[in-house]
Amino acid sequence: HLDSAAGVAGFIKTVLSLHHRTLVPTVHFTTPSPRIDWDSSPFYVNAETRAWETDRLPLRAGVSAFGIGGTNAHVVLEEAPPRVHGQSDSGPRVVPLSARSPEALRAAVRRLADHLEAHPGLPLDDVAGTLQLGREAFRHRAALVASDTGEARELLAAGDPTHLVIGDAGEPVDGYVFLFPGGGAQYLGMARDLHRRYPAFRQEVDRGLDLLREREGVDLRPIWFAEPDDAAANDAFQRPSVQLPALFILEMGLARHLMRWGFEPTALIGHSLGENTAACLAGVVNYEDALGLVALRGRLFDDAAPGGMLSVTADPDTVRARLGPTLDLAAVNGPEQCTVSGPREAIDALAAKLDSEGIDARVVPIDIAAHSSLVEPLLEPFEAYLRSLELHPPQIPFLSNRTGTWITDDEATDPAYWAAHL
Protein backbone atom coordinates (compact mmCIF):
# COMPACT_ATOMS: atom_id res chain seq x y z
CA HIS A 1 0.00 0.00 0.00
CA LEU A 2 1.32 3.45 -0.86
CA ASP A 3 -0.09 4.90 2.36
CA SER A 4 -0.79 8.63 1.85
CA ALA A 5 0.27 8.32 -1.79
CA ALA A 6 -2.46 5.82 -2.55
CA GLY A 7 -3.62 6.18 -6.12
CA VAL A 8 -0.46 7.84 -7.47
CA ALA A 9 0.79 4.69 -9.20
CA GLY A 10 -2.60 4.15 -10.80
CA PHE A 11 -2.71 7.79 -11.84
CA ILE A 12 0.68 7.56 -13.58
CA LYS A 13 -0.27 4.27 -15.21
CA THR A 14 -3.51 5.76 -16.55
CA VAL A 15 -1.82 8.90 -17.90
CA LEU A 16 0.65 6.71 -19.80
CA SER A 17 -2.17 4.49 -21.05
CA LEU A 18 -3.98 7.54 -22.41
CA HIS A 19 -0.80 8.85 -23.99
CA HIS A 20 -0.01 5.55 -25.73
CA ARG A 21 -3.69 4.70 -26.29
CA THR A 22 -2.95 1.25 -24.89
CA LEU A 23 -4.64 -0.87 -22.19
CA VAL A 24 -2.12 -2.84 -20.17
CA PRO A 25 -2.78 -6.05 -18.21
CA THR A 26 -3.47 -5.95 -14.49
CA VAL A 27 -0.48 -7.08 -12.45
CA HIS A 28 -0.79 -10.53 -10.80
CA PHE A 29 -4.28 -11.11 -12.17
CA THR A 30 -5.00 -14.75 -13.07
CA THR A 31 -8.61 -15.69 -12.31
CA PRO A 32 -11.67 -13.45 -11.90
CA SER A 33 -13.36 -13.54 -8.50
CA PRO A 34 -16.39 -15.86 -8.38
CA ARG A 35 -18.07 -13.46 -5.96
CA ILE A 36 -18.72 -10.96 -8.82
CA ASP A 37 -21.37 -11.60 -11.46
CA TRP A 38 -19.10 -10.63 -14.37
CA ASP A 39 -21.58 -11.74 -17.04
CA SER A 40 -24.17 -9.23 -15.85
CA SER A 41 -21.65 -6.42 -15.46
CA PRO A 42 -20.04 -4.06 -18.00
CA PHE A 43 -16.81 -4.38 -16.05
CA TYR A 44 -13.92 -6.77 -16.59
CA VAL A 45 -10.32 -7.15 -15.51
CA ASN A 46 -7.94 -6.52 -18.38
CA ALA A 47 -5.54 -9.44 -18.74
CA GLU A 48 -3.63 -8.56 -21.92
CA THR A 49 -2.02 -5.62 -23.68
CA ARG A 50 -4.28 -4.26 -26.38
CA ALA A 51 -4.99 -1.07 -28.29
CA TRP A 52 -7.32 1.36 -26.60
CA GLU A 53 -9.67 2.45 -29.34
CA THR A 54 -13.11 4.00 -29.30
CA ASP A 55 -15.32 5.89 -31.68
CA ARG A 56 -16.35 8.19 -28.86
CA LEU A 57 -13.41 10.50 -28.49
CA PRO A 58 -11.76 11.70 -26.39
CA LEU A 59 -10.62 8.76 -24.28
CA ARG A 60 -11.44 9.03 -20.59
CA ALA A 61 -10.54 6.96 -17.54
CA GLY A 62 -11.25 6.99 -13.81
CA VAL A 63 -8.68 6.43 -11.08
CA SER A 64 -9.76 5.62 -7.53
CA ALA A 65 -7.56 6.12 -4.48
CA PHE A 66 -8.29 4.62 -1.07
CA GLY A 67 -5.89 6.05 1.48
CA ILE A 68 -4.82 4.02 4.47
CA GLY A 69 -6.32 6.68 6.71
CA GLY A 70 -9.73 6.27 5.14
CA THR A 71 -9.51 8.88 2.38
CA ASN A 72 -11.49 8.03 -0.74
CA ALA A 73 -10.84 9.97 -3.94
CA HIS A 74 -11.72 9.54 -7.58
CA VAL A 75 -10.08 11.35 -10.49
CA VAL A 76 -11.40 11.42 -14.05
CA LEU A 77 -8.68 11.76 -16.69
CA GLU A 78 -9.14 12.72 -20.34
CA GLU A 79 -6.64 12.42 -23.15
CA ALA A 80 -4.96 15.63 -24.29
CA PRO A 81 -6.10 17.12 -27.60
CA PRO A 82 -3.86 16.42 -30.59
CA ARG A 83 -0.87 18.71 -30.76
CA VAL A 84 -1.09 21.02 -33.74
CA HIS A 85 2.17 22.08 -35.35
CA GLY A 86 1.10 25.30 -37.02
CA GLN A 87 3.27 27.56 -39.11
CA SER A 88 4.45 30.18 -36.65
CA ASP A 89 5.52 33.66 -37.59
CA SER A 90 9.18 33.95 -38.44
CA GLY A 91 11.27 36.30 -36.41
CA PRO A 92 13.38 36.50 -33.29
CA ARG A 93 12.39 34.86 -30.03
CA VAL A 94 13.63 35.52 -26.49
CA VAL A 95 15.16 32.41 -24.91
CA PRO A 96 15.49 32.88 -21.11
CA LEU A 97 17.25 30.74 -18.51
CA SER A 98 17.60 31.13 -14.76
CA ALA A 99 19.18 29.35 -11.80
CA ARG A 100 19.86 29.71 -8.09
CA SER A 101 23.61 30.31 -8.53
CA PRO A 102 26.04 31.45 -11.25
CA GLU A 103 27.46 27.92 -11.47
CA ALA A 104 24.02 26.39 -11.91
CA LEU A 105 23.20 28.99 -14.57
CA ARG A 106 26.32 28.15 -16.58
CA ALA A 107 25.38 24.47 -16.32
CA ALA A 108 21.86 25.25 -17.53
CA VAL A 109 23.28 27.09 -20.54
CA ARG A 110 25.45 24.08 -21.41
CA ARG A 111 22.55 21.65 -20.97
CA LEU A 112 20.30 23.66 -23.25
CA ALA A 113 23.03 23.93 -25.89
CA ASP A 114 23.56 20.15 -25.74
CA HIS A 115 19.81 19.53 -25.88
CA LEU A 116 19.40 21.69 -28.99
CA GLU A 117 22.41 19.97 -30.53
CA ALA A 118 20.78 16.58 -29.96
CA HIS A 119 17.35 17.76 -31.16
CA PRO A 120 17.95 20.16 -34.06
CA GLY A 121 14.37 19.78 -35.28
CA LEU A 122 12.81 21.37 -32.19
CA PRO A 123 10.82 24.49 -33.12
CA LEU A 124 12.32 27.53 -31.43
CA ASP A 125 8.78 28.72 -30.65
CA ASP A 126 8.28 25.65 -28.45
CA VAL A 127 11.65 26.01 -26.74
CA ALA A 128 11.18 29.71 -26.03
CA GLY A 129 7.57 29.27 -24.95
CA THR A 130 8.41 26.51 -22.48
CA LEU A 131 11.28 28.48 -20.96
CA GLN A 132 9.22 31.67 -20.75
CA LEU A 133 6.04 30.19 -19.31
CA GLY A 134 6.90 26.80 -17.87
CA ARG A 135 9.88 27.49 -15.64
CA GLU A 136 10.29 29.25 -12.32
CA ALA A 137 12.43 32.37 -12.58
CA PHE A 138 15.39 32.41 -10.19
CA ARG A 139 17.71 35.29 -9.34
CA HIS A 140 20.60 34.48 -11.70
CA ARG A 141 19.44 34.84 -15.28
CA ALA A 142 20.55 34.61 -18.88
CA ALA A 143 18.76 35.45 -22.10
CA LEU A 144 19.42 35.55 -25.80
CA VAL A 145 17.50 36.46 -28.93
CA ALA A 146 17.55 34.02 -31.84
CA SER A 147 15.56 33.45 -35.01
CA ASP A 148 15.83 29.66 -35.12
CA THR A 149 17.00 26.67 -33.10
CA GLY A 150 20.36 26.49 -34.85
CA GLU A 151 21.18 30.10 -34.09
CA ALA A 152 20.14 29.65 -30.46
CA ARG A 153 22.40 26.60 -30.12
CA GLU A 154 25.38 28.48 -31.58
CA LEU A 155 24.89 31.50 -29.33
CA LEU A 156 24.56 29.31 -26.24
CA ALA A 157 27.67 27.35 -27.12
CA ALA A 158 29.73 30.46 -27.85
CA GLY A 159 28.67 32.30 -24.70
CA ASP A 160 29.40 35.64 -26.37
CA PRO A 161 28.26 38.34 -23.91
CA THR A 162 27.16 40.57 -26.81
CA HIS A 163 24.47 37.99 -27.60
CA LEU A 164 24.02 35.99 -24.39
CA VAL A 165 23.13 38.46 -21.66
CA ILE A 166 23.88 37.22 -18.13
CA GLY A 167 23.09 39.01 -14.90
CA ASP A 168 21.15 39.08 -11.67
CA ALA A 169 17.49 39.96 -11.46
CA GLY A 170 16.78 43.31 -9.89
CA GLU A 171 14.13 44.04 -7.34
CA PRO A 172 10.58 43.45 -8.59
CA VAL A 173 9.06 46.56 -10.13
CA ASP A 174 5.80 47.93 -8.80
CA GLY A 175 4.43 48.58 -12.28
CA TYR A 176 5.00 49.99 -15.72
CA VAL A 177 4.43 53.45 -17.19
CA PHE A 178 3.55 53.76 -20.87
CA LEU A 179 4.79 56.92 -22.62
CA PHE A 180 3.14 57.99 -25.90
CA PRO A 181 4.86 60.51 -28.21
CA GLY A 182 3.14 63.22 -30.20
CA GLY A 183 3.21 64.45 -33.77
CA GLY A 184 6.58 64.32 -35.48
CA ALA A 185 7.52 60.87 -34.19
CA GLN A 186 6.24 59.17 -37.34
CA TYR A 187 8.38 57.61 -40.08
CA LEU A 188 7.65 55.46 -43.11
CA GLY A 189 7.43 51.75 -42.42
CA MET A 190 7.22 52.14 -38.64
CA ALA A 191 6.47 48.81 -36.95
CA ARG A 192 6.46 47.04 -40.33
CA ASP A 193 8.20 43.96 -38.91
CA LEU A 194 5.85 43.79 -35.92
CA HIS A 195 2.89 44.08 -38.27
CA ARG A 196 4.21 41.19 -40.35
CA ARG A 197 5.28 38.88 -37.53
CA TYR A 198 2.65 39.22 -34.82
CA PRO A 199 -0.94 38.43 -35.80
CA ALA A 200 -2.46 40.02 -32.68
CA PHE A 201 -0.57 43.28 -33.24
CA ARG A 202 -1.48 43.21 -36.94
CA GLN A 203 -5.14 42.71 -36.07
CA GLU A 204 -5.10 45.67 -33.69
CA VAL A 205 -3.43 47.98 -36.23
CA ASP A 206 -5.60 46.79 -39.12
CA ARG A 207 -8.67 47.45 -37.01
CA GLY A 208 -7.70 51.12 -36.79
CA LEU A 209 -6.68 51.37 -40.43
CA ASP A 210 -9.96 49.83 -41.59
CA LEU A 211 -12.00 52.05 -39.30
CA LEU A 212 -10.21 55.17 -40.54
CA ARG A 213 -10.81 54.20 -44.16
CA GLU A 214 -14.49 53.44 -43.57
CA ARG A 215 -15.30 56.53 -41.48
CA GLU A 216 -12.89 59.14 -42.79
CA GLY A 217 -12.14 57.90 -46.30
CA VAL A 218 -8.40 57.89 -45.54
CA ASP A 219 -6.34 54.84 -46.55
CA LEU A 220 -3.04 54.98 -44.65
CA ARG A 221 -1.59 51.67 -45.82
CA PRO A 222 0.06 52.86 -49.07
CA ILE A 223 1.72 55.70 -47.16
CA TRP A 224 2.53 54.04 -43.85
CA PHE A 225 4.14 50.95 -45.35
CA ALA A 226 5.87 52.70 -48.25
CA GLU A 227 9.62 52.34 -48.70
CA PRO A 228 11.77 54.91 -46.85
CA ASP A 229 12.94 56.51 -50.11
CA ASP A 230 9.39 57.16 -51.35
CA ALA A 231 9.41 60.96 -51.56
CA ALA A 232 5.66 61.30 -52.19
CA ALA A 233 4.83 59.13 -49.18
CA ASN A 234 7.28 61.09 -47.03
CA ASP A 235 5.58 64.33 -48.01
CA ALA A 236 2.15 62.85 -47.30
CA PHE A 237 3.29 61.69 -43.87
CA GLN A 238 3.97 65.29 -42.90
CA ARG A 239 0.27 66.15 -43.21
CA PRO A 240 -1.42 66.12 -39.79
CA SER A 241 -4.47 64.32 -41.20
CA VAL A 242 -2.15 61.43 -42.09
CA GLN A 243 0.49 61.33 -39.38
CA LEU A 244 -1.70 61.91 -36.32
CA PRO A 245 -4.13 59.00 -36.95
CA ALA A 246 -1.17 56.79 -37.88
CA LEU A 247 0.58 57.56 -34.60
CA PHE A 248 -2.58 56.98 -32.58
CA ILE A 249 -3.24 53.62 -34.27
CA LEU A 250 0.38 52.54 -33.76
CA GLU A 251 0.51 53.66 -30.13
CA MET A 252 -2.69 51.82 -29.26
CA GLY A 253 -1.47 48.75 -31.13
CA LEU A 254 1.85 48.71 -29.27
CA ALA A 255 0.15 49.28 -25.91
CA ARG A 256 -2.32 46.45 -26.43
CA HIS A 257 0.50 44.21 -27.66
CA LEU A 258 2.56 44.83 -24.53
CA MET A 259 -0.49 44.25 -22.34
CA ARG A 260 -1.05 40.87 -24.00
CA TRP A 261 2.50 40.01 -22.99
CA GLY A 262 1.69 40.81 -19.37
CA PHE A 263 2.95 44.39 -19.13
CA GLU A 264 -0.05 46.04 -17.49
CA PRO A 265 0.54 49.78 -17.07
CA THR A 266 -0.03 51.33 -13.67
CA ALA A 267 0.28 54.85 -15.08
CA LEU A 268 0.36 56.63 -18.43
CA ILE A 269 1.77 59.81 -19.89
CA GLY A 270 1.41 61.20 -23.38
CA HIS A 271 3.00 64.14 -25.16
CA SER A 272 0.52 66.28 -27.09
CA LEU A 273 -1.35 63.80 -29.33
CA GLY A 274 -0.03 61.06 -27.04
CA GLU A 275 -2.32 62.27 -24.26
CA ASN A 276 -5.28 61.40 -26.51
CA THR A 277 -3.86 57.88 -26.72
CA ALA A 278 -3.41 57.76 -22.95
CA ALA A 279 -7.01 58.86 -22.47
CA CYS A 280 -8.24 56.12 -24.77
CA LEU A 281 -6.19 53.41 -23.07
CA ALA A 282 -7.34 54.68 -19.68
CA GLY A 283 -10.98 54.32 -20.71
CA VAL A 284 -11.85 58.04 -20.86
CA VAL A 285 -13.04 57.65 -24.45
CA ASN A 286 -13.67 54.53 -26.52
CA TYR A 287 -11.43 53.55 -29.43
CA GLU A 288 -13.80 54.57 -32.22
CA ASP A 289 -14.49 58.01 -30.74
CA ALA A 290 -10.82 58.59 -29.94
CA LEU A 291 -9.78 57.79 -33.50
CA GLY A 292 -12.50 60.12 -34.78
CA LEU A 293 -11.21 62.84 -32.46
CA VAL A 294 -7.63 62.39 -33.67
CA ALA A 295 -8.77 62.39 -37.30
CA LEU A 296 -10.65 65.66 -36.72
CA ARG A 297 -7.59 67.10 -35.01
CA GLY A 298 -5.56 66.23 -38.10
CA ARG A 299 -8.07 67.73 -40.54
CA LEU A 300 -8.30 70.95 -38.55
CA PHE A 301 -4.52 71.23 -38.45
CA ASP A 302 -4.39 70.64 -42.22
CA ASP A 303 -6.56 73.71 -42.73
CA ALA A 304 -4.85 75.85 -40.10
CA ALA A 305 -2.37 78.58 -40.82
CA PRO A 306 0.99 77.00 -41.77
CA GLY A 307 3.56 76.83 -39.04
CA GLY A 308 6.18 74.71 -37.36
CA MET A 309 7.61 73.55 -34.06
CA LEU A 310 11.10 73.53 -32.60
CA SER A 311 12.51 71.27 -29.88
CA VAL A 312 15.06 73.20 -27.80
CA THR A 313 17.51 71.86 -25.25
CA ALA A 314 17.40 74.74 -22.81
CA ASP A 315 15.52 75.88 -19.71
CA PRO A 316 12.24 77.80 -20.08
CA ASP A 317 13.71 81.19 -19.09
CA THR A 318 16.45 80.89 -21.70
CA VAL A 319 13.90 80.01 -24.35
CA ARG A 320 11.41 82.75 -23.40
CA ALA A 321 14.14 85.39 -23.62
CA ARG A 322 14.66 84.52 -27.29
CA LEU A 323 11.04 84.34 -28.43
CA GLY A 324 9.73 86.95 -30.83
CA PRO A 325 6.17 88.30 -30.77
CA THR A 326 4.85 85.55 -33.07
CA LEU A 327 6.30 82.55 -31.21
CA ASP A 328 4.87 80.67 -28.22
CA LEU A 329 6.47 78.42 -25.64
CA ALA A 330 4.27 75.44 -26.47
CA ALA A 331 5.56 72.92 -23.94
CA VAL A 332 8.00 72.56 -21.07
CA ASN A 333 8.96 68.90 -21.29
CA GLY A 334 11.72 68.97 -18.69
CA PRO A 335 14.10 71.29 -16.83
CA GLU A 336 16.08 71.83 -20.04
CA GLN A 337 13.75 70.58 -22.75
CA CYS A 338 11.20 72.92 -24.32
CA THR A 339 9.11 73.12 -27.47
CA VAL A 340 8.47 76.35 -29.36
CA SER A 341 5.60 76.79 -31.80
CA GLY A 342 4.70 79.44 -34.37
CA PRO A 343 5.01 80.55 -38.01
CA ARG A 344 7.55 78.59 -40.06
CA GLU A 345 9.74 81.60 -40.90
CA ALA A 346 10.00 82.59 -37.25
CA ILE A 347 10.77 78.98 -36.27
CA ASP A 348 13.58 78.76 -38.84
CA ALA A 349 15.00 82.10 -37.70
CA LEU A 350 14.99 81.02 -34.06
CA ALA A 351 16.65 77.71 -34.96
CA ALA A 352 19.46 79.59 -36.71
CA LYS A 353 19.88 81.98 -33.78
CA LEU A 354 20.05 79.18 -31.23
CA ASP A 355 22.53 77.27 -33.39
CA SER A 356 24.79 80.33 -33.49
CA GLU A 357 24.69 80.40 -29.69
CA GLY A 358 25.55 76.72 -29.37
CA ILE A 359 22.09 75.76 -28.11
CA ASP A 360 20.77 72.49 -29.53
CA ALA A 361 17.51 73.01 -31.41
CA ARG A 362 15.79 70.64 -33.81
CA VAL A 363 12.85 71.29 -36.09
CA VAL A 364 10.00 68.87 -35.41
CA PRO A 365 8.94 67.12 -38.65
CA ILE A 366 5.41 68.51 -38.61
CA ASP A 367 3.82 71.35 -40.61
CA ILE A 368 1.68 72.85 -37.86
CA ALA A 369 2.13 75.20 -34.94
CA ALA A 370 0.32 73.16 -32.31
CA HIS A 371 -0.19 74.61 -28.83
CA SER A 372 0.20 78.17 -30.10
CA SER A 373 -2.04 81.14 -30.81
CA LEU A 374 -2.28 80.01 -34.44
CA VAL A 375 -4.66 77.17 -33.46
CA GLU A 376 -7.16 79.35 -31.58
CA PRO A 377 -9.64 79.35 -34.52
CA LEU A 378 -9.74 75.53 -34.26
CA LEU A 379 -10.87 75.34 -30.65
CA GLU A 380 -14.59 75.90 -31.20
CA PRO A 381 -15.21 73.12 -33.79
CA PHE A 382 -12.95 70.78 -31.84
CA GLU A 383 -14.83 71.35 -28.59
CA ALA A 384 -18.16 70.96 -30.38
CA TYR A 385 -17.14 67.46 -31.47
CA LEU A 386 -15.91 66.66 -27.97
CA ARG A 387 -19.30 67.56 -26.51
CA SER A 388 -20.87 64.84 -28.66
CA LEU A 389 -18.70 62.18 -27.01
CA GLU A 390 -19.25 60.21 -23.83
CA LEU A 391 -16.27 60.82 -21.54
CA HIS A 392 -15.52 58.74 -18.44
CA PRO A 393 -13.17 59.05 -15.45
CA PRO A 394 -9.83 57.35 -16.18
CA GLN A 395 -9.36 53.75 -15.06
CA ILE A 396 -5.57 54.13 -15.29
CA PRO A 397 -4.02 57.33 -13.88
CA PHE A 398 -2.21 59.54 -16.36
CA LEU A 399 -0.34 62.83 -16.17
CA SER A 400 -1.86 65.97 -17.62
CA ASN A 401 0.09 67.95 -20.22
CA ARG A 402 -1.67 71.09 -19.07
CA THR A 403 -1.08 70.87 -15.30
CA GLY A 404 1.98 68.66 -15.00
CA THR A 405 0.29 66.50 -12.38
CA TRP A 406 -2.25 63.67 -12.34
CA ILE A 407 -5.34 64.45 -14.33
CA THR A 408 -8.51 64.67 -12.25
CA ASP A 409 -11.83 63.04 -13.08
CA ASP A 410 -13.34 66.48 -13.68
CA GLU A 411 -10.60 67.43 -16.13
CA ALA A 412 -10.71 64.13 -17.98
CA THR A 413 -14.47 64.40 -18.54
CA ASP A 414 -14.48 68.11 -19.45
CA PRO A 415 -14.60 68.81 -23.23
CA ALA A 416 -13.11 72.26 -22.57
CA TYR A 417 -9.98 70.63 -21.11
CA TRP A 418 -9.37 68.65 -24.29
CA ALA A 419 -10.14 71.61 -26.54
CA ALA A 420 -7.60 73.77 -24.70
CA HIS A 421 -5.19 70.85 -25.05
CA LEU A 422 -4.72 71.84 -28.71
Q: What is each residue range found by the language model?
A:
Residues 8-16, 46, 74, 78, ...:
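Predominant activation on well-ordered alpha-helical scaffold segments within soluble catalytic domains
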Residues 1-44, 66, 88-96, 103-106, ...:
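Acyl-CoA/ACP chain-elongation machinery
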Residues 23, 28, 43, 85-92, ...:
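Short acidic (Asp/Glu) and glycine-rich catalytic loops that position anionic groups and cofactors
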Residues 36, 44, 54, 59-176, ...:
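Flexible catalytic loop/linker elements that gate and position reactive groups at enzyme active sites
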Residues 5-9, 99-110, 121, 146-150, ...:
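Electropositive phosphate-/nucleotide-binding environments in soluble metabolic enzymes
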